[in-house]
Every structure is written in C-alpha cells, then in structure tokens.
Amino acid sequence: MKRAVVVFSGGQDSTTCLIQALHHYDDVHCITFDYGQRHRAEIDVARRLAGQLGASAHKVLDVGLLNELAISSLTRDNIPVPTQSEDGIPNTFVPGRNVLFLTLAAIYAYQVEAEAVITGVCETDFSGYPDCRDQFVQALNHAVCLGMARDIRFETPLMWLNKAETWALADYYGQLARVRHDTLTCYNGVQGDGCGHCAACHLRAHGLQQYLANPAAVMAALKRKSGLQ
C-alpha cells in the first residue's frame, strides 16, 4: 500500500497538495501544527477539510515551543502583518518552522510506515522564506534519511509552479471552488478570499486573476511542468 503524510495547514497550497495526494496514494495522513499562530482558525479549517476530502487520519500536534523561540508577525499580535511583499525576508517568516514541521512529519511518517512526506512549499512564487527553497528541502531530506536510516521522500509538487498554476492544479482535479472558498491562507485568519490586504491575500488573488484570465494557457503550462495529461 502506498502511504503518504501531508503537512497540512488548511491553506490553498497544502489543500491542493492533499487533493493531489489522494489521487496518487492509497492511504493519506495529514499532520497539522499548532504553534500559537495568530491565524489559529486554520487549525479548525484543516480539521474540517481533512475529513471532507477523505484523509485516513489527521494528527494535530502542539508545538507551542516554536512560538516561544520564533518572533514573527505570525506569532506575535503586536507585530503588524505586512500588506505587501517586502524586500528580503519578511516579518511573517517564522525561523525554523519548516525545519521543525518537516522533521516532525518525517517522524510521523516513520511510525505509520509512509514512503513520502508532502509539503506545499514553493520557490517560484513565494514570500521570500528561505525554508521554502528546493535546496533547503533536499538538504533536510538527506539529513532525515541518514538520521532515521530509512528512505522517506520529501515531495514538493508545487515547488516550480507559480500561483496561477497552483490554481490550475486545483481546477485539474475539479476542486477549484473548494480551494477558493473553504481554505484559509490569509495571515489575518479570514477564510476564502481572505482580508484582501495582507501579502498572502495579494499573492493568492493575483494568481487567481491570472488563471481565470487565461485558463487554457495556464493549464497547458501546468501540464508541461508537472507531466499531467
């Protein structure tokens, strides 16, 4: 049986990854992390979506220690969330978040004998986070396999897709409306199209506009990149 673990926040990217994983794997587990994020409503959204989409299990882990160590606008209410993309590393970056999340997801994958950990990080159309880069994911994957003496593959299906192509991927599986209306990507914790002001909402909305303006061309680009038929 092919089994995978999806790092699942209930946002656009991880939900799209879960939808695709359910088509590629026989058994899909989700793992969600509660680190005291200001947009904690995403945890309830993740629980609901994991059940609706048919994940076989969903584990929510308390990693509040990350909140104590990592100072960010996503972990501190007194630090304002930026309304547009910043040069350099933005204040929404949570240091060590993906180091911790991917490592814990790999431990869970080890226990349930999953062959892959799937994460929705992306280098093409991203927010400037260093732990979303392909180089980082590959390096950590290598270290985890050495440390566990087991081959657990880190999969990043969105790594080289832009936001418009990520919308196309959801549409390819017939789930565009669900991803648009039922996920939570907004840094201010507003479901669906979000607050419309934060950097995450701007990126998401711009990608959707690009896709809806020319769906055939974007879908064709997605298929070329991903090998979908």
UniProtKB/Swiss-Prot annotation:
One of its GO terms (molecular function) is ligase activity, forming carbon-nitrogen bonds. Keywords: ATP-binding, Ligase, Metal-binding, Nucleotide-binding, Queuosine biosynthesis, Zinc. Zn(2+) binds at residues 186, 195, 198, 201. Binds 1 zinc ion per subunit. Its EC number is 6.3.4.20. InterPro entries: QueC, Rossmann-like_a/b/a_fold. ATP binds at residues 8-18. GO terms for biological process: queuosine biosynthetic process. Its cofactor is Zn(2+). It is an enzyme of class 6 (ligase). It holds the Pfam family QueC. Catalyzes the ATP-dependent conversion of 7-carboxy-7-deazaguanine (CDG) to 7-cyano-7-deazaguanine (preQ(0)). Belongs to the QueC family. This is 7-cyano-7-deazaguanine synthase. The lineage of its organism: Bacteria, Pseudomonadati, Pseudomonadota, Gammaproteobacteria, Enterobacterales.
